Structure formats: structure tokens, C-alpha cells
């Protein structure tokens, strides 16, 4: 019986090897998730009370997922092969947040050190949200969530 199993395994050679590698990579992918900073956690709290899945659509259906991502935000930082519906997942939402911050919340762009207030207000109000008075209330909510 052992010989038969061996020969079956040998007969599948590369397929068996590929399956083992694929399984190992999938296990690793599941185990590794995006780490969440206190600011991201606070924004998540403000946006959806830390909803993890099947989050309600916000802004009259214009924003989706745990971080309430608008299509325009996603379009700014998406990569080939990604879909807007991926924003429904927390890990992907965090990646979009990080990419958006890397693009818009930079010292070079703001011409000064970037603060959590800048990041939160940019997230809420777009690339120039850090300047908009309309994002001040949002920052207060995020700040309160940071203190909880």
C-alpha cells in the first residue's frame, strides 16, 4: 500500500508539488492580514461602527465597505485586476486607505508635517479635505473615537 501511494504521488509529481505550494500560500495569505493603526480603527469606528462585513452603503449608496469608500477614491488608487466591490472587505479597505494617504497625505504635498487630523480630513473630504471647514466635525468624531 505504501508503494502504491508513493507511486501515485510520484505520478502526480509537479501537480502534487503545485498543490502543496498553493495550499501553503493560501494558509499564509489567510494568516497575514493588514495591521490596523489607531487612526484607521477610529475612522472605521466613525464610518461603520467597525462593521466587518455586509456593511450598509453610506452617502445615499455612494460609499461601500467598512471604511465607506467612494468610487472616485478607489479609482485614484486602484491597481490592475482590482474591483470596486473588493472595498467591501476590511483588509482591502485598509489597503485603499493606505494608498490614498500615500498619494495625498504627504509632507511634499501639504508642505509641512502630516498629522492624523490631516489624514482623517483628507479621507473624509478628498485630496483637499484637510483645508475644508466641512471636515472639521468629522475630525472631532475621529478624535473622540481615538480617545475611547
PLM segments and residue spans:
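Sec-dependent N-terminal signal peptides
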Residues: 22-31
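Short, functionally critical alpha-helical segments immediately adjacent to catalytic or ligand/cofactor-binding
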Residues: 35-52, 69, 97, 118-127
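Alpha-helical segment that forms one wall of the substrate-binding/catalytic cleft
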Residues: 71-130, 139-147
Amino acid at each position: 500500500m505504501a508503494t502504491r501511494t508513493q507511486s501515485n504521488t510520484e505520478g502526480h509529481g509537479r501537480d502534487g508539488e503545485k498543490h502543496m505550494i498553493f495550499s501553503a500560500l493560501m494558509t499564509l495569505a489567510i494568516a497575514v492580514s493588514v495591521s490596523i493603526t489607531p487612526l484607521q480603527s477610529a475612522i472605521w469606528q466613525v464610518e461603520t461602527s467597525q462593521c466587518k462585513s455586509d456593511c450598509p452603503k453610506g452617502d445615499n449608496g455612494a460609499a461601500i465597505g467598512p471604511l465607506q469608500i467612494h468610487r472616485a477614491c478607489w479609482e485614484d488608487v486602484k491597481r490592475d485586476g482590482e474591483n470596486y466591490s473588493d472595498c467591501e472587505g476590511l483588509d482591502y479597505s485598509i489597503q485603499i486607505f493606505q494608498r490614498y494617504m500615500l498619494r495625498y497625505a504627504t509632507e511634499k504635498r501639504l508642505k509641512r508635517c502630516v498629522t492624523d487630523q490631516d489624514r482623517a480630513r483628507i479621507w473624509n473630504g478628498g485630496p483637499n479635505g484637510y483645508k475644508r471647514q466641512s471636515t472639521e466635525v468629522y475630525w472631532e468624531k475621529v478624535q473622540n473615537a481615538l480617545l475611547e
